[in-house]
Amino acid sequence: MSAISSALLWKKIRKGLSAGRVQSVATRLVVDRENEIRAFVPQEYWTLDVNLNRAGKPGSFTAHYYGDPQKRELTSEQDVQSVLDALEGQPFSVTGVKKSEKKRTPAPPFITSTLQQEASRKLNMTPRRTMMIAQQLYEGVEISGEGSVGLITYMRTDSLRISEEALAAAGDAIRSRYGAAYYAEPRRYKPKSGAQDAHEAIRPSNVALYPEAVEHDLTKEQYRLYKLIWSRFIASQMTNALYDVTAIEAACGSHVFRATHQSMKFSGFTAIYEEGRDDEQEKLDSPLPDLAPGEALTASGFDKQQHFTQPPARYTEASLVRAMEEKGVGRPSTYATIVATIQDREYVIKKDKRLSPTPLGVVVTDLMIEHFNDVIDVEFTANMEHQLDEVEAGKRNWKAVLREFYKGFHAEMEEAEEALDGKRIKVPDEVSDEVCELCGRQM
């Protein structure tokens, strides 16, 4: 499929292009996201906060408007003003105090996709660079007094399986380094649906080789990646982090405001590792005073803020890998290559760590959708991946799979050749944000 459809791109657009089955879908994900962003219509909304003081006692706090009393969105300044008018000069009181304990469980050890995502977030490494350094750690590094040592298990895997020996070694390391309170029992993680499970999860080959013990034998990148893998694996076997959560509800008439605060009770796995995030972390309220239901409060000020809903974010390399994994597109051995290839082919460009389609990427994707819609369909590609897995497992005949695919693809190819006969597709010039000083147009 790749060679045939690539030949069509060569003839109709320009030489050097390719339309691999998975890379075409990866490019389409980026193009589709850009279309979502361009079609997005921001929606106005407002937030309203109140600063509340205790009557005759020290301690103030900020609460956020919730509703009257059911949850209500403030969609205009008029909505906010109607609430403020109702609250003017009126007393508040505490209508609810809820205290609870919240637990956070550690993330499982790395598989290929999550290693690439986390190395991108925390180490600013591209998927391709991550896999190159991981390959070095797997194949072996010269360790003083030890010779060449493979520091990690195989790095192309979608399995969460951990050997019993590694589980026991992790438990010993945790008890020795952090204390018995940080280890309860081995954690065995369930594999995700469709995982091939040929290899273990990515982990240190020898847990006893602490990162700092081998740091002087490693390059900076090798050390940082090894430390990330070691820490994630050890954290995956540690106890939960525990938090004390206090939720306050205050009301004035029918209008309800809420405030929540959480404080760490026991660090658990967070003593060594916390998973990175692609999105902004939710802001938590400041510590709250020790309030009782029915307690009187007075408002000392209000803060109203206008906001607009935001379009979906462009993919980072890490979030594109995650999207491919979630949709069943590609395999652990191909994620890094695919993300790199669509940039090398100039279908996608990276700016400020975010991926955008180029005019060429849009043209190629539109052409593929118009003439090879099944092939570039995400579900079709995921299903093809599943069929290829079954071929590899001996459950399906490869000739039958190929015959079934080629029958539909050949018909689409003939139709495309006929529809595009004699036509040459022009790629629009890319327009930048810079303005020409001479003519005033965008360059």
Feature map (PLM): residue ranges:
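Positively charged, polyanion-binding regions of nucleic-acid-associated proteins
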Residues: G89-T105, Q117, G301-Q310
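Conserved short loop/turn motifs at secondary-structure junctions
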Residues: I13-G16, K99-P108, E118-M125, T153-I162, ...
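Phosphate-backbone binding and catalysis cores of DNA-processing enzymes
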Residues: M1-E101, Q135, A201-R258, S263
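Core structural elements
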Residues: M1-S6, V22-S24, V50-R54, K102-T114, ...
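DNA-recognition alpha helix
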Residues: T114-K122, Q135-S144, A318-E326
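Glycine-rich phosphate/pyrophosphate-binding loops
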Residues: T126-M132, I143, S148-L151, Y335-I338
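Basic, low-complexity terminal or inter-domain segments flanking catalytic cores
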Residues: A39, S76, V80, K98, ...
